[in-house]
Swiss-Prot record:
Positions of NAD(+) binding: Y12
PROSITE patterns the record matches: FLAVODOXIN_LIKE
Gene3D superfamilies per the UniProt record, alphabetical: 3.40.50.360
The EC number(s) this enzyme carries: 1.6.5.2
Enzyme class: oxidoreductase
Taxonomic lineage from the root: Bacteria, Pseudomonadati, Pseudomonadota, Gammaproteobacteria, Oceanospirillales
Any single Gene Ontology cellular-component annotation: membrane
Record-given protein name: NAD(P)H dehydrogenase (quinone)
Catalytic activity entry: a quinone + NADH + H(+) = a quinol + NAD(+); a quinone + NADPH + H(+) = a quinol + NADP(+)
GO molecular function annotation: flavin adenine dinucleotide binding; FMN binding; NAD binding; NADH:ubiquinone reductase (non-electrogenic) activity; NADP binding; NADPH dehydrogenase (quinone) activity
UniProt family annotation: Belongs to the WrbA family.
Binding residue positions for FMN: 10-15, 80-82, 115-121, 136
Amino acid sequence: MSKVLVLYYSSYGHVETLANAVAEGVRGVAGTQVDLYRVAELVPDEVAAKSGYKEDTTAAVLDDPSVLAEYDAIVVGTPTRFGNMASQMRNFWDKTGGLWAQGKLIGKLGGAFTSTASQHGGQETTLTSIHTTLLHHGMAVVGVPYSCPALTELDEVSGGTPYGATTIAGGDGSRQPSENELTIARFQGQHIAEMAAKLAG
């Protein structure tokens, strides 16, 4: 049995919705276990409350980076912060030096997904900022191939790239992930789970 981790950070719930869709896609692959965790919030509680951060999440916080070594594939989700991963996710990965030194993640699969306010708000640079970290750990990056028809959907403004699933939240965050974007996220989860199963033999 292969094990897939979906690890995310979400301020307002957009990335969390994508994370659940990715996990749903993973669950559709027989013989695969999927775990869904989030990283810790760094913003003080009072600031998060005033900013309207989503607080009703059910995913547990993953505090111990050493747990990553137990998985065959890790899919990482974070909203963009100026074209890069959010500091909460960066903080988590900055604690993985021990894993890197021991080569614990070499040969494992990795993927990424994100949200931005606008269509051109840094989706692909955020995804590649995640990819860079995964590659430094010796992981093999798996994206979303164009065998996913939703990538070329033209009937709506939609997120979704070959680098990973994405969503567009709007300037005020009011837009939630569309069905097309969720389809891409589910496809991504299924695809990386199938790849992990093949490698696990």
